[in-house]
């Protein structure tokens, strides 16, 4: 313990000292009768180390000159007792000695109260040796210098004696317990503990070491005593910690200080019971720790003469010592330290140890001891862990994962998705996000692409769709890709990243399927040509139906060569139609476009989300922003994968200028039977790399394929806009107004038969016919579709073994109560249409069945001419002031061949059956066409066309599941391998999945362009009849109600945050 100290000379020898309070020290002394040169005084001093003068005289009382000097002093609670003999020359006072005097400290003044004689002797050699007051100042004990010592217990308040304790020996010191109940005193070799109430002895100890001379005693607490003793045969001091109990006194701890102290003249314990102060005969002050009985600080030569008293302040901050040399020393306690000698000794020991350690290290380095120690420890580690660790021989080492990295890239598949965010002007503002969620399951070694649930129906169950058209203007959504370099995934160790040209006005957003590179090559290319918007078909349900497509390894090489040739043959002349070079995605599947298989299956080789816009119209391109490049994302997958591609769009489109009100078209499929089945596309992956699978897990967020359907059901109702906007009519002269948009080119692309629940816009729309609502669905998955959505799911595939042919597509239409048949001028498709369309019948005028027949001998072109001629009346649109809406089912099917789309059968409600034509000569947008999808309600409604002026949302999700290879030939129909027998009809059992939901969609200025459809392609559009809830807040997939989509009239798109999904603007 270290601190500052201050000295003060009071001018007389000091025999007693005690702190009255934290800053006031009371001392007493004098020369006595034998040295009259020193006055006898009682002085109060102020101690404050914050002031310049740390100790100053505060109060003082001077005693009579004939009195003896004060020899003892104690105080508590401002009550002061001083032992001082008085001497009188008066003979009448010869037998009286008032040796005990009482003072009080009131209002910072010393006041004399009384004096009394308890010794009853006038011998001047007898003086008051000890005066002690308990902490509450209720009991005091005094003892004289007479031997044997008599201890008198008195009441300091009235100075009365209670009883006496005859010790029979000389008492060296005494002290009260903190509770004031016990009193302990010591002689040279014994200790006594007595009760203050009656004076009976409680405990006694007399068997101390004979070399110890007990000199001082203090209570640490009510049951613990600290005794200081000097050594009789040598220099030094011992401290003994004693415990007092009913069984006696027991030594708890002992410490000796041989070289530091020589005899003890005074002792005191700090009020906090942490330190004990000792003064020795050689004028040293030692501070010892009470807990460990170790020397904390030794202050040498504090006084020049013998130290008479040491005392602590009540707050334990100051330690004061007095001496016979008239001086007072006050030490401010601020820390812990030891004596100088002890510090020097510790430094010497540390230095020696440091030298020895340095020498040992140098010697060990010289003899390579550290090397032997390391080798020995390494051998122990290897022997211990290698014996207990068994490494699977079939798996790669945990510490050599980078060695197999090239193997990972060879076995992985590259999936590229391009997301573009562009600023668009005011009313043409749009908001589009794409999100993909994937789950993997490590069950099998083979990978298939399939949908979660499929449906099956025969070719006789041909669905129909309703169509309507009207004249309006619409905004175009334009995005751009970044290069025209294709993305080819081949079984090589290098990773080909897609590059894009920033100047190319083409946007293709492609979340494609992960397939093994040994079986299927993914081809994504973009050319200088402009891929144009198909007809806006707002998909309310998304359907993934496919059939197993297998191929041998020998056919893969040929397919790759054909893909390379196809990429190299980009021509600017094809810039106005969606050709194979501008397709979104191609899968070389080595399929033959035989006419016998054109309509027998619903087969798709890829799923691609394509959003493009015609840029020929300067009005549509004036507001486009081409300055922001696209970002490309590559994902490596080799395991069983389930993907959910979510698209959310926001459109703010003004109301239609048409005065006609909305009309509801209701259709039905009379004999469609849908049953669940497993649908798979592509060939299995021969091997799955385990490390690549681990890499895939880190890239994608896991989910479960079974839970996707339930998530769709739970949020579909919240994703439908509350405005129920019905269909409007379109001008029939729209096609003829753009005759330059028709060109001849083969369309060799695949469409993944995505379920579209909507009303297809067509210029061939005519008066609706009654329909029968008997179509059933096995399961409905509610997926909302945005207003004015123009998202078309397309996929392209290139075939090397079959030469694609271009054929004209004829549109079929039937007027009221009339039966019309359609013929195709291409003879090789005749048998297929006749085989598949013959059993199909549609009721016209509620009674007469209308059949669509195909005949190879008599091609009919009347409807083709009607499409190109603005004067030809295809049908009359049934428009009225208001139209009753009935919740019925509607479906449409679009047929296609390798060269072009064969057509689409549509049941357009009342009185008209039309087959929509996707002729190879049609590629230009039709101005003034408005497509509307009715909301699904169970009761009739009347909604005016003026209510169309509202914004809506579309959320579109495509779920793609990659499963293990299983034998599915027995499930839900017979499937044949196309690679083995492409001329044989694959199956008449169309495997598909129907997912249904409701939406409201209004689109203006929709372009009509040829849909990119492959040789084996059937597009089914169904319209179920669930009730749409009247709310616009779209709940996220995780049912988090706090995440909303805000739909306002200012065309501000709100961001949707899905838990576990990655949203991109």
UniProtKB/Swiss-Prot annotation:
Functional description taken from the UniProt entry: Putative guanine nucleotide-exchange factor (GEF) involved in the formation or budding of transport vesicles from the ER. Positive regulator of SAR1 probably through inhibition of the GTPase activation by SEC23.
Bias-annotated ranges (Low complexity): 465-476, 568-621
InterPro entries (alphabetical): Sec12-like, WD40/YVTN_repeat-like_dom_sf, WD40_repeat_dom_sf, WD40_rpt
Localization per Swiss-Prot or TrEMBL: Endoplasmic reticulum membrane; Golgi apparatus membrane
Membrane topology annotation: Single-pass type II membrane protein
Region annotation Disordered: where it falls in the sequence: 458-477, 482-520, 551-625
Lumenal side: 366-1065
Residues with PTM Phosphoserine: 65
Sequence repeat coordinates: 824-833, 834-843, 844-853, 854-863
Segments in the Cytoplasmic topological domain: 1-346
Disulfide-bonded cysteines: none
Protein family: Belongs to the WD repeat SEC12 family.
Protein name: Putative guanine nucleotide-exchange factor SED4
Compositional bias segments (type: Polar residues): 482-495
PROSITE patterns: ER_TARGET (PS00014), WD_REPEATS_REGION (PS50294)
GO BP: any one term: endoplasmic reticulum to Golgi vesicle-mediated transport
GO cellular component terms, semicolon-separated: cytoplasm; endoplasmic reticulum membrane; Golgi membrane
WD repeat extents: 259-298, 302-341
GO molecular function: GTPase activator activity; guanyl-nucleotide exchange factor activity
Positions of short motif Prevents secretion from ER: 1062-1065
């Amino acid at each position: 313990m270290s601190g500052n100290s201050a000295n003060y000379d009071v001018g007389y020898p000091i025999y007693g000292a005690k702190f009255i309070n934290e800053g006031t020290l009371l001392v007493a002394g004098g020369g006595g009768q034998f040295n009259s040169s020193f006055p006898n005084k009682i002085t109060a001093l102020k101690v404050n180390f914050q002031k310049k003068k740390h100790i100053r005289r505060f109060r003082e009382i001077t005693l009579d000159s004939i009195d003896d000097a004060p020899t003892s002093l104690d105080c508590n609670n401002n009550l002061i007792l001083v032992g001082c003999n008085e001497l009188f020359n008066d003979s009448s006072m010869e037998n009286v000695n008032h040796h005990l005097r009482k003072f009080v400290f009131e209002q910072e003044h010393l006041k004399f109260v009384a004096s009394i004689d308890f010794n009853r002797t006038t011998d001047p050699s007898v003086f008051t040796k000890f005066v002690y007051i308990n902490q509450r100042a209720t009991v005091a004990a005094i003892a004289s210098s007479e031997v044997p010592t008599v201890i008198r217990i008195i009441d300091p308040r009235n100075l009365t004696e209670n009883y006496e304790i005859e010790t029979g020996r000389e008492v060296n010191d005494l002290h009260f317990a903190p509770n004031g109940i016990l009193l302990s005193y010591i002689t040279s070799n014994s200790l006594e503990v007595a009760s203050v109430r009656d004076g009976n002895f409680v405990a006694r100890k007399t068997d101390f070491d004979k070399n110890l001379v007990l000199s001082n005693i203090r209570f640490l607490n009510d049951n613990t005593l600290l005794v200081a003793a000097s050594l009789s045969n040598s220099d030094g001091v011992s401290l003994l910690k004693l415990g007092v109990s009913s069984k006696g006194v027991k030594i708890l701890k002992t410490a000796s200080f041989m070289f530091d102290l020589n005899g003890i003249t005074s002792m005191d314990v700090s009020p906090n019971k942490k330190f004990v102060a000792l003064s020795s005969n050689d004028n040293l002050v030692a501070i010892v720790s009470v807990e460990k009985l170790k020397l904390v600080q030794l202050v040498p030569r504090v006084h020049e003469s013998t130290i008479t008293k040491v005392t602590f302040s009540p707050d334990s901050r100051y330690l004061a010592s007095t001496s016979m040399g008239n001086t007072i020393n006050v030490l401010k306690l601020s820390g812990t330290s030891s004596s100088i000698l002890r510090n020097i000794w510790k430094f010497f020991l540390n230095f020696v140890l440091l030298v020895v350690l340095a020498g040992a290290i140098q010697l060990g380095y010289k003899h390579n001891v550290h090397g032997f120690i390391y080798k020995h420890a390494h051998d122990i580690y290897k022997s211990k862990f290698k014996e207990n660790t068994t490494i699977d021989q079939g798996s790669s080492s945990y510490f050599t994962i980078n060695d197999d990295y090239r193997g990972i890239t060879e076995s992985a598949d590259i999936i590229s998705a391009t997301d573009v965010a562009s600023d668009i002007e005011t009313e043409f503002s749009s908001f589009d996000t794409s999100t993909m969620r994937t789950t993997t399951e490590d069950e099998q070694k083979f990978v298939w692409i399939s949908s979660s649930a499929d449906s099956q129906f025969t070719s006789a169950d041909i669905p129909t769709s309703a169509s309507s058209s009207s004249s309006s203007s619409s905004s175009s959504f334009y995005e751009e890709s970044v290069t025209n370099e294709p993305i080819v995934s081949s079984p090589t160790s290098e990773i080909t990243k897609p590059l894009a040209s920033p100047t190319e006005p083409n946007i293709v957003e492609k979340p494609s399927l992960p397939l093994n590179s040994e079986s299927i090559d993914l081809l994504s290319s973009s050319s200088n040509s402009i891929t144009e918007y198909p007809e806006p078909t707002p998909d309310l349900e998304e359907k993934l139906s496919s059939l197993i497509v297998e191929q041998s390894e020998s056919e893969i090489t040929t397919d790759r060569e054909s893909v390379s040739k196809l990429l190299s043959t980009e021509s600017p002349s094809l810039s106005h139609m969606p050709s194979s070079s501008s397709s979104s995605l191609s899968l070389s599947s080595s399929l033959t476009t035989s006419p016998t298989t054109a309509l027998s299956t619903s087969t798709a080789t890829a799923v691609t989300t394509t959003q493009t816009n015609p840029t020929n119209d300067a009005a549509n391109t004036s507001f486009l922003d081409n300055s922001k490049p696209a970002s490309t994302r590559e994902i490596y997958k080799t395991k069983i994968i389930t993907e959910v591609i979510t698209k959310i769009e926001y459109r703010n489109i003004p109301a239609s200028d048409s005065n006609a009100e909305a009309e509801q078209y209701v259709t039905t499929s009379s004999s469609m039977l849908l049953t669940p089945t497993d649908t798979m596309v592509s060939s299995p992956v021969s091997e799955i790399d385990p490390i690549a699978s681990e890499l895939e897990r880190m890239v994608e967020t896991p989910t479960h394929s079974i839970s996707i359907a339930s998530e769709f059901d739970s949020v579909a109702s919240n994703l439908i806009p509350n405005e129920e906007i019905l269909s409007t009519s379109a001008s029939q002269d729209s096609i003829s107004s753009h005759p330059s948009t028709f060109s001849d080119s083969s369309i060799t692309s695949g469409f993944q038969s995505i379920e579209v629940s909507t009303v297809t816009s067509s210029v061939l729309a005519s008066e609706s016919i009654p329909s029968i609502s008997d179509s059933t669905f096995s399961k409905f998955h509610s997926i909302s579709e945005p207003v004015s959505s123009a998202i078309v799911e397309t996929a392209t595939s290139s075939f090397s073994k079959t030469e694609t042919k271009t054929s004209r597509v004829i549109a079929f239409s039937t007027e009221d109560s009339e039966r019309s048949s359609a013929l195709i001028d291409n003879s090789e498709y005749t048998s297929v249409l006749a085989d598949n369309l013959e059993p199909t019948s549609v009721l016209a005028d509620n009674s007469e069945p209308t059949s669509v027949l195909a005949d190879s001998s008599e091609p009919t072109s009347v409807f083709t001419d009607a499409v190109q001629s603005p004067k030809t009346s295809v049908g009359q649109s049934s428009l009225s002031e208001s139209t009753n809406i009935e919740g019925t089912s509607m479906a449409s099917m679009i047929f296609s061949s390798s060269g072009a789309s064969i057509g689409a059968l549509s049941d357009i409600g009342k009185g008209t059956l039309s087959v929509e034509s996707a002729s190879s000569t049609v590629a230009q947008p039709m101005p003034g066409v408005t497509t509307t999808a009715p909301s699904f309600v169970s009761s009739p409604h009347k909604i005016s066309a003026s209510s169309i002026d509202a914004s809506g949302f579309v959320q579109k999700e495509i779920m793609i599941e990659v499963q293990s290879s299983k034998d599915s030939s027995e499930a839900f129909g017979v499937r044949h391998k196309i690679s083995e027998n492409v001329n044989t009809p694959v199956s008449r059992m169309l495997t598909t999945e129907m997912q249904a939901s409701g939406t409201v969609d209004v689109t203006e200025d929709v372009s009509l362009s040829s849909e990119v459809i492959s040789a084996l392609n059937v597009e089914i559009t169904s319209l179920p009849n669930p009730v749409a809830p009247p709310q616009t807040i779209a709940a996220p997939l995780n049912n988090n109600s706090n995440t909303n989509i805000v739909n306002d009239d200012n065309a501000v798109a709100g961001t949707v945050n899905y838990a576990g999904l990655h949203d991109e603007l």
